[in-house]
Amino acid sequence: MTNKELQQLTETISLAFFKRPFTHTARFNNRLRTTGGRYLLKSHDIELNPKQYERYGKEELIGIIKHELCHYHLHLEGKGYKHGDKDFQEWLAKTGAPRYCKTAQDEQTVLVYTCTSCSRTYHRRRKINTQKYVCGTCHGKLKFLSKKVLHQRK
């Protein structure tokens, strides 16, 4: 899906569910990692995570667009547009928009280190300075072994 198709889809959803036009820009943002989308308060644009569309399809994307359009229309009307506001929660229920999107992070990278003396393995999310840190069991030197990618269950 291109940004132009996304713009048309957003305008269509806005008219169908909110009976109001969407007059700003909707676009994909590849830098979004942990969120499905965001509404920009200053420019009134909507940015969406393209990975959500690639992984979960058009239905999930439509749900995220509805969620962001709730923020958009409530903000423009001067009503409560934040997640905790009553107006926002009512609009989510009325339009069938999800409160949360499916997780954007399906993969997790784990670094594996091993002790050169006792062969104990360490699994870490962050890099270890092997010049500074040693094995907790025998105080031997640590050596980088490999990088694993773990897939989370759905």
From Swiss-Prot:
Binds 1 zinc ion. InterPro entries: SprT-like_domain (IPR006640), SprT_Zn_ribbon (IPR035240), Uncharacterised_SprT-like (IPR023524). GO terms for cellular component: cytoplasm. GO terms for molecular function: zinc ion binding. Its main location: cytoplasm. It is found in: Cytoplasm. NCBIfam families: PRK04351.1. This is Protein SprT-like. It comes from Shouchella clausii (strain KSM-K16) (Alkalihalobacillus clausii).
